[in-house]
A protein has these predicted regions:
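Non-catalytic, surface beta->alpha helical segment in thiol-disulfide oxidoreductase systems
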Residues: 77-109
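Structural motif corresponding to alpha-helix initiation and N-cap regions
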Residues: 2-6, 56-60, 94
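Acidic beta-strand-to-loop metal/phosphate-binding motif
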Residues: 21, 74-77
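Thiol-based oxidoreductase modules, predominantly thioredoxin-like and allied folds used
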Residues: 42-61, 70
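N-terminal leader/targeting and pre-domain segments
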Residues: 1-19, 109-110
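Local sequence-structure signature of Cys/Sec-based thiol-disulfide redox active-site neighborhoods
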Residues: 10-47
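Short, hinge-like loop/turn segments at secondary-structure boundaries
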Residues: 39, 67-68
């Protein structure tokens, strides 16, 4: 991954409390997995930045290398990689996602 791509990824993570690297946008997800994570965050009423990896091939490949995670979407909360769709879904269902958001002081629907 080139430095420009790495810096772009790091900037998104550093400047957004909750950042979702996804296919499509929060209002128009382009895959079911991105839609699922977006919906979970919307149900919790968490403000988040959706980064459309389909707009930039280097970004799409780079985020996988950056996180050492092979799939998209990828969720970051307060600069920490949380996981992809399956992990986020499991955390949402068992209450762990809500707890992390609360513990990190992020506003959401309680």
């Amino acid at each position: 991954m080139d430095d420009k791509t790495k810096n772009l990824i790091q900037n998104h993570i550093d400047t957004n409390e909750v950042c979702l690297f996804m296919k499509g946008t929060p209002d128009a997800p382009q895959c079911g997995f991105s839609m699922a994570v977006t919906n979970m965050l919307k149900i919790l009423e968490v403000n988040f930045k959706g980064v459309n990896v389909l707009e930039n091939e280097k970004l799409r490949q780079g985020i996988k290398e950056f996180s050492d995670w092979p799939t998209i979407p990828q969720l970051y909360i307060k600069k920490e990689f949380v996981g992809g769709c399956d992990i986020v879904k499991e955390m949402y269902e068992n209450g762990e996602l809500k707890k992390i958001i609360e513990d990190k002081g992020i506003n959401f629907k309680k």
